[in-house]
A protein has these predicted regions:
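Glycine-centered recognition micro-motifs in short, flexible terminal segments and loops
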Residues: 1-20
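N-terminal helix-rich module
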Residues: 2, 21-146
Length: 146
């Protein structure tokens, strides 16, 4: 008895399905990395402006919208980052906002080490941005409370 052979149309269907799945995962990761880099650069720029211009910069997250405000120059920048899933950063002025000064963020933080922002893709991939009390913006999780 000869072994069964796959019909060409089934083989093409399976290969197209695998290619579509690989493309979907690559596209999802690309969106996550693009939004991560955009948010990371936004926070680093806010910290740099606060440090070198000796001013206060307020970063507010309202859902998927991020607003950066410099009260001294009345400059406001608003951008949308669709993959923001959670902002875990509380200040004395309110929730979901980060206030950068030339000394960092500790002056307005409610928690000792700062907080984090989580970005989650459609397929569930996650990346975290941690902003600590000195205003340093790094990739990673918020440290556990001590």
């Amino acid at each position: 008895m000869a072994p069964k052979r796959l019909k060409p149309k089934y083989l093409i269907f399976v290969l197209l399905f695998v290619a579509a799945a690989v493309f979907a995962v690559a596209w999802d990761l690309s969106r996550l990395n693009t939004d991560f880099n955009k948010m990371f650069a936004l926070l680093r720029t806010a910290r740099t402006d606060a440090f070198y211009k000796d001013t206060t910069v307020i970063v507010r997250c309202n859902g998927k919208t991020v607003t950066v405000t410099d009260p001294n120059t009345s400059t406001t920048t608003t951008t949308t980052i669709p993959l923001i899933a959670r902002v875990d950063y509380d200040t004395t002025f309110g929730k979901d906002m980060i206030i950068f000064t030339w000394r960092g963020t500790e002056q307005y933080n409610k928690r000792v080490h700062g907080g984090e922002i989580m970005l989650r893709s459609v397929l569930g991939f996650r990346r975290y941005i941690h902003v600590n009390c000195t205003g340093l913006v790094t990739e990673g999780r918020y440290p556990e409370d001590e």
